[in-house]
């Protein structure tokens, strides 16, 4: 990992020299590169494991529906990169597989996602200390979160099984990240 950090540092320094960036701009560029590399690594691990366990499409449908809502609803993050990897594997590889394997009843899934939709309506967007949401964007993000959730619900009615359950799972997982219990007092 140290070698990757060194390469990021070298590339950020190169960009700083090439574009006459001040120190703050350099730090922003370096952080951006670190985030991209970290997210790429998490994606490779998650989808690599999904391929190994033959759950790629299950993972993809769950993850895409989760991400589409999260794009505007935001929500809690894992406390560390390792915990993020573990949560990704549990929530986007193991849980979709279990959902399909046990053939969870659609009535149960729609009941759970109804509660999740209420959580999205009530709590979205949910800012964090590291990722605050400007007040002028809050209403727009709330509306987009609700609209995307409704569109995904409509798609779930049209999608074949097990993909409808996986779409509903993605919505439900995202709605759970909005709960205030996942935010320290100072983040609220």
From Swiss-Prot:
Q: Which Pfam families match?
A: AgrB
Annotated membrane-spanning segments are 49-69, 100-122, 143-163, 164-184
Which terms are listed as keywords in the entry? Cell membrane, Hydrolase, Membrane, Protease, Quorum sensing, Transmembrane, Transmembrane helix, Virulence
Q: Which GO terms describe its cellular component?
A: plasma membrane
Q: Which family does it belong to?
A: Belongs to the AgrB family.
HAMAP family (UniProt xref): AgrB
Q: Which domain of life does this protein belong to? A: Bacteria
GO MF term list? peptidase activity
Q: What does this protein do?
A: Essential for the production of a quorum sensing system signal molecule, the autoinducing peptide (AIP). This quorum sensing system is responsible for the regulation of the expression of virulence factor genes. Involved in the proteolytic processing of AgrD, the precursor of AIP.
Q: What is this protein called?
A: Accessory gene regulator protein B
Q: Give the UniProt subcellular location, in the record's own words.
A: Cell membrane
Membrane topology term reads: Multi-pass membrane protein
EC top class named in words: hydrolase
InterPro entries tied to this protein:
AgrB
Q: Gene for this protein?
A: agrB
User: Known EC number(s)?
Assistant: 3.4.-.-
